[in-house]
Amino acid sequence: MSVLEGKKIIVIITGGIAAYKTASLVRLFVKRGCEVQIIMTPEAHNFITPLTLSTLSKNPVYTQFFDGKTGQWNNHVDLALSADYIVVAPATSNTLSKMASAKADNLALATYLSAKNVVFFAPAMDLDMYKNPFNKENIEKLQQKGDILIPPNKGELASGLEGEGRMAEPEEILNFIENFARKNLIFYKKKILITAGPTYEPIDPVRFIGNHSSGKMGFEIAKASEKLGADVTLISGPCSQKLSHYSSIERINVMSSEEMYQAVIDYYHNNIDIVIMAAAVSDYRPETISKIKIKKNEESFSLPLIKNKDILLELGASKRNQFLVGFALETNNEEENALKKLQQKNLNMIVLNSLQDKGAGFSYDTNKITILDNKGNIEYFDLQTKEKVAENILKSIHEKIKT
């Protein structure tokens, strides 16, 4: 999933030969899930048609302050304030000069001057124009203002000369902006280990001890963590949840509590920053596993159980600088039991949900949680979708790490 999904991007196209490349850039933004609004300078029409750009962006293309046929006013202030990012590509020497000197003689420039968001500009011009001291001064002015330069490439230029001034390729511009967006996410470069789903403890080749966990909560936390820039490892018990469009999440599938224990321990000391144990791990397993199917010969059946390793307890005991989060699903004395678990297992935070709450717990797409931490703070939340719950959990973690 792209960090740009859902972002609104204004693409300003100016009158340079590289304008034809911007069609590919628009297409890439749209494929990343962006809403793209294009503004062309009048000169840009000489190099690419509004019809092409409108088709690719799925939005009308603006050039003038108002439509001469309908009288519709294209409000440059509203346009500027509606966007997350503005991308000027290609940015000609003429346009850079006007941007640096606060000229507003067309809709594109007026929109730029009204912007309070991040502006990227990708210069495109001949070598001597790019190296010209006045042009360099204009670029420096824009950078001092806070605009971000996407450096041009070296290569064959429109004049036939070789050198610096060739607009960065569409894929390079996209990657540049994605990397910028990722670096500004709250969990950028943080390594987060998440567990999800149930564990199955085999009795014989066809039967097992398990629970009703669907894995939805853990998977939503993994997805939300990835959106916030984290490097995510998800250790999942058997469940039907998918990670479509989240290819950067490393998923490790396990079956039993012993397999989950081993996987968690293997990753725990691998520079992990945050551990979120959302899995419903079986507390007990059969003392012996039958190699053949057990027949129902007797009226009663006794199955000796032995205790599984307590993964959270072990993590808490060996914790260094990791932020450790546990989950507690309770049926009675909820806060008391959750607080006891928090303290006994040396957790930083615990997420409590109760089976007494309608719409919360296993299999539902919603959940109602209470968050307790090791400093005595308690946060209560209403019933929400598990996607929103995941966002609130991560927001709470971020705030507690900051303090």
Annotate each language-model stretch with its function.
Residues M1-F120, D126-L329, N333-T403:
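A cross-family phosphate/adenosyl-ligand binding-site feature
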